[in-house]
Amino acid sequence: MSGAQPSQGQPSESANSEFVFRRDYRAPRALVLSAWTDPEQLAEWWGPHGFTNRVCELDPRSGGRLRIEMHGPDGTVYPVVGVYEAVESDRVVFTCLPLDEQGAPLFEIESAVTFAERASGGTTQTVRTRVRRVSPGAAIHLVGMEAGWSQSLERLENHLAQRGHVRPAASVRA
């Protein structure tokens, strides 16, 4: 049900880690896209189970910035800043930098999210996330990334369902 393709081994400070997630939704492409580009909607589902987003600032256009502060169940704040590389009707590409307690980047995450209309109706969403430029000692922060993305996309499923859209047609491994 996670919709995830397992990564190749444990992340390391010199290795690139890539994760691919694919989900099919019985919702129009424009509605799935808006869940990624509207700050109010993104704040409702972004992050693992139990996380909230008290700050969610998005400027979804090429060169636009994003800033999110995820709050974990234990109260820990996980700030993320980034830049949109492309925002189109069928894809969103952005780079995120999770920050440490001093505001220094831990690593860089490049994500490409594509939205394809299905002939039978609905939308296939594919998320490709690649980790790059891991700071010395920051690899430990990557351990739960695949599970975190899976949980975040489960929250997106629930978000779309709460907005009156039927649950995804399928969650499959890419």
Residue ranges of model-derived segments:
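A generic structural micro-feature
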Residues: 13-15, 60, 74-78, 103-107, ...
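Hydrophobic/aromatic beta-strand elements that line small-molecule binding cavities or substrate pockets
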Residues: 23, 55-58, 80-86, 108-117
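Basic/polar N-terminal segments that are highly enriched at the extreme N-terminus
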Residues: 1-13, 158-174
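Short hydrophobic/aromatic-rich beta-strand segments that constitute the beta-sheet cores
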Residues: 21, 66-68, 91-96, 125-127
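Short beta-edge strand/loop motif at the mouth of beta-sheet-based domains
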Residues: 20-21, 40-77, 168-174
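Hydrophobic ligand-binding cavity/cleft-lining segments
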Residues: 1-52
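A short, structured loop/turn motif at beta-sheet edges
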Residues: 29-30, 60-61, 85-91, 114-124
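Beta-strand/loop substructures that line and gate deep hydrophobic ligand-binding cavities in soluble
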Residues: 99-150
